[in-house]
A protein has these predicted regions:
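Substrate-binding groove of N-acetylhexosamine-processing glycoside hydrolases
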Residues: 201, 215, 224-228, 323, ...
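Sec-dependent signal peptide recognition
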Residues: 11-19
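Structural preference for beta-rich elements and adjacent junctions enriched in aromatics
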Residues: 606-838
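N-terminal secretory signal peptides that target proteins for export/translocation
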Residues: 1-12
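Acidic, contiguous N-terminal accessory segments
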Residues: 19-23, 30-113, 126, 219-225, ...
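Extracellular/periplasmic catalytic domains that process cell-envelope and extracellular macromolecules
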Residues: 38-41, 82-83, 114-117, 324-325, ...
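Feature activates predominantly on carbohydrate-active enzymes
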Residues: 105, 109-364, 376, 407, ...
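Solvent-exposed, polar/charged alpha-helical surfaces in well-ordered, non-transmembrane soluble domains
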Residues: 58-61, 65, 69, 190-193, ...
Length: 838
């Protein structure tokens, strides 16, 4: 009997030791089930489905990752409950949420439940993987062969090769690093981020640079029961850096942490899909609009909406898109840069009485409505979408009620709403559209934040954004906003936080959070931002932001306001340690203010009587070949101007220097014919770099002051020698390389220089290319001087665009003002002469 008792005791001890050993192998946890984390130890585990979807898996990983960063505790992810004593966090749909009778029914567009019990927390939304119907389901692999195969299947399916494959850009939505697609449903992920925000987490900027996390060793199980639906089903910000397939992990995660997503966008310029293949161009040239006596084939072509067969083809295409790909909506919007057609069929279709923004409204919207009416008969629950854009912004005067399936994407210039008149005009147009549309939420808006980030002064407009988004709640299904300041390469892990987001990160953050809750107090949201993002500089940065917003309309023209803003910012800089995260964030804003500092310098120079430097607009860089041949069509469209003496006003030298100039949105182009004295030959070409002795002989000087830099100098001799440098006062920086592409062509008694000078907006590389914004309009112009120096009998002879009054090109207050398009005064005069009808 005693022996049996000893054996039982030994068994009990063995079982106890085995239990203790197993417990040592498991993550540290607490015994009570009231805490997710207690004293740095795990008090919960994360439960997901046996076969989780892509986004469900990511949601669990994000929760695990951030709980660890916040508390140091490691929560286990499992497909089943492993310890009844732990809090169960059910992330996404599983057999456990089914047993608790929590359903995803009705949770559309990333809506979610957050429900707690005595020992569990449900974070539940729709997490379905995006379905990829139709030919091209494997294009996301970015395999060119798969694209070719899909196109063959598509052509066979539709019986011809006129239509563009709908799924051709699917690769852009797939993140290889995360293993998710942009259109995957992500309701549970939104619930995870809501939970983390309730703990104090914020994501103001991509990566750890913009991450704000609390530090705590204890996280209680919240008592919560709520269902959250976004105020706007569609919450899209687009641009090359905002496509999962082109961007990187930190940018893709930032987008999701902001809450972007929801209802997919049907796209813009949908008519491209039925005219942008060679078969249409070859077999149906009449489907392209007529301009200047020729069919518009350039850039894949622009359609003639009156042409025979185009409407019928578009109707068939849209129905095929709905049937084969399961799309809910389709765009039938005309191509970008759509202009009036001069063919006989289009005569009388235009409405100049509706003003510049309505001259094509009746023409375009009749076409859209005709497509919609036919499609409505077979697909009444699908949407036909077109953007009110360009010359068809105004609602049509010949249609009282649009077909019920027409959804209008209104061109919403929110950045300009700091001007009450522009906002009133936009709302007036919106209300006119609402009279003609029948569905509950009949439109989306299309905006563009690019120019907010490209402004020479800080364009922070959180209150304007809040006011406009509130006005759209309930009548607008969502928004589609372009942001093209940022490029994918600037988001690589080895790159610093991009300066191009220094302004727009706040505009984007505010927009994204208001899309979920339009009625929240914007000042509470902003005060939270100032405190969490700038720490010890909270009050000073708040004063800076508020001053910038209050004076945003006039600051670009006021040196006093720019100086005041810079002074306020200087107070914030004094509050932070530059090496701290707060100092780095303030430092990023400081870099973005270089354009304001340069604008202040420009405004301080008297340039009231300078001449105009007006390049011809080049739309397509690809067609321009730098070879010294000025007989190309793009140069033939421009006129020569002759350079004049620098120190004798209006004197044209006998030995001429002729100049042509052009500009695209990314490069400045110059062409010069430099006459020489009869019988004089230049030396053999020798493309030598950065030898200052070039200035002792003959050369062409190109001096460019952008909106962000004092000025750049590029000097080129007839022998092909080049010197390029940055000039800032007395400082000369020869490290800078313009990366200019140039060619010199010599003939008897003249030499020709053709040059392409690239530029980048908010160029993060200080040693390459011009740093400057495309000077559209005169609010942030460039200042340029182009000159030529030659020598006769040992005496220098100078001629240039600007009359400097001395034997020098470098008199900055005389540089010619360069901007594209009309000046503010010219636009105001035109608007007064021809008011746009309300």
């Amino acid at each position: 009997m005693l022996l049996e008792k000893n054996i039982e005791k030994r068994k009990s001890l063995l079982y106890y030791l085995m239990f203790v050993g197993i417990m040592f192998l498991l993550p540290e946890h607490v015994e009570a089930n009231e805490f997710i984390v207690k004293d740095g130890k795990a008090g919960a585990e994360i439960i997901i489905a046996e076969n989780p979807t892509r986004m469900q898996k990511l949601a669990a990983e994000e929760l695990q990752f951030f709980i660890h960063k916040i508390s140091g505790a490691n929560l286990m992810i499992s497909t089943s409950v492993t310890d009844e004593n732990l809090v169960k966090i059910y992330v996404g749909k599983s057999s456990y949420t089914d047993a608790l009778k929590h359903s995803t029914e009705g949770l559309k567009y990333d809506a979610y439940h957050m429900i707690s019990g005595n020992d569990y927390l449900v974070l539940l939304g729709n997490d379905e993987d995006a379905s990829m119907k139709g030919p091209g389901d494997n294009i996301y692999k970015r395999d060119s062969k798969s694209s070719e195969e899909a196109t063959e299947k598509w052509d066979k399916l539709v019986g011809h090769s006129r239509w563009v494959l709908p799924g051709r850009s699917r690769y852009q939505s797939y993140s290889r690093e995360l293993g998710v697609r942009y259109n995957d449903q992500r309701g549970s992920l939104m619930a995870v981020y809501d939970l983390l925000r309730s703990l104090g987490a914020r994501w103001y900027f991509p990566g750890e640079f913009g991450e704000v996390l609390p530090q705590t060793k204890t996280i209680a199980l919240p008592k919560v029961k709520k269902t959250i639906h976004p105020d706007f089903p569609m919450r899209q910000i687009t641009g090359s850096a905002y496509k999962f397939g082109k961007s990187n992990k930190r940018q893709a995660l930032w987008m999701m942490r902001l809450g972007l997503g929801g209802l997919p966008v049907s796209g813009v310029h949908g008519i491209n899909n039925i005219i942008h293949r060679d078969e249409t161009r070859n077999d149906h040239p009449e489907r392209f609009l007529l301009t200047r006596g020729k069919r518009a084939f350039a850039g894949h072509g622009k359609p003639c909406l009156s042409s025979k067969g185009l409407l019928e083809d578009n109707i068939k295409y849209v129905r095929t898109l709905f049937d084969v790909y399961g799309k809910e909506s389709a765009s039938v919007m005309p191509t970008d840069g759509f202009v009036t057609c001069a063919c006989d069929l289009c005569k009388g279709e235009f409405t100049p009485e509706l003003g510049a923004r309505g001259v094509q409204s009746n023409h375009v919207w009749t076409y859209v409505n005709n497509v919609a009416k036919e499609v409505y008969q077979t697909h009444p629950n699908h949407k036909i979408v077109c953007l009110a854009y360009g010359s068809y912004v105004v609602s049509p005067s010949n249609i009282d009620r649009m077909s019920p399936n027409v959804y209008v994407m209104l061109n919403n210039g929110r950045g300009g709403f700091v001007d009450p008149e522009l906002r009133d005009l936009s709302i007036s147009r919106r209300n006119e559209w609402l009279k003609k549309l029948t569905s509950k939420q009949p439109f989306t808006t299309h905006g563009n934040y690019t120019w907010l980030g490209n402004s020479p002064v800080p364009w922070y407009i959180p209150h304007t954004i809040a006011e406009d988004i509130r006005s759209l709640k309930g009548i607008c299904i969502g928004e589609y906003i372009e942001e093209n300041c940022l490029r994918p390469g600037e988001l690589r892990d080895d790159q610093p936080a991009p300066v191009k987001l220094a302004i727009n990160h706040l505009n984007i953050y505010v927009t994204a959070r208001l899309w979920w809750d339009a009625d929240q107090d914007i000042d509470v949201l902003l005060n939270d931002y100032y405190k969490k993002f700038y720490g010890p500089a909270e009050k000073e940065m708040k004063a800076f932001f508020e001053y910038c917003e209050a004076n945003v309309r006039t600051m670009a023209r006021s040196k006093e306001q720019i100086q005041k803003a810079l002074d306020l910012f200087g107070l914030a800089e004094e509050k932070v340690d530059k090496s701290s995260i707060y100092g780095q964030r303030v430092g990023l804003i400081s870099k973005s203010l270089d354009s304001s500092r340069n604008l202040l310098r420009q405004l301080s120079v008297d340039r009231s009587n300078v001449s105009r430097f007006k390049p011809f607009r080049f739309d397509n860089d690809k067609e321009i070949v730098i070879d010294g041949d000025l007989e190309d069509p793009y140069w033939k469209r421009t006129r020569f101007g002759q350079l004049k003496s620098t120190n004798v006003e209006n004197h044209k030298p006998k030995i001429k220097t002729l100049l042509k100039k052009g500009m695209s949105t990314s490069s400045l182009y110059l062409a010069l014919i430099c006459e020489t004295e009869e019988g004089k030959q230049t030396e053999k070409l020798n493309k030598k770099k950065d030898d200052p002795s070039i200035w002792e002989g003959e050369y062409v000087d190109i001096l460019i002051e952008t909106d962000t830099h004092a000025y750049y100098q590029i000097s080129i001799s007839p022998n092909g020698e080049l010197v390029d440098l940055k000039v800032n006062g007395e400082k000369q920086d020869f490290r800078w390389d313009s990366l200019a592409e140039y060619a010199i062509k010599k003939s008897e008694n003249q030499w020709v220089l053709e040059i392409k000078i690239p530029f980048l907006t908010n160029n993060g590389d200080p040693n390459h290319k011009l740093d400057g914004r495309y000077p559209k309009g005169d609010k942030a112009p460039w200042y340029i001087n182009v000159g030529r120096k030659r020598t006769k009998e040992g005496k220098p002879l100078l001629c240039s665009v600007a009359h400097t009054g001395v034997d020098s090109f470098h008199v900055i207050e005389k540089f010619a003002r360069c901007f594209m398009g009309k000046s503010s005064a010219e636009r105001a005069a035109k608007a007064t002469a021809k008011p746009i009808p309300e």
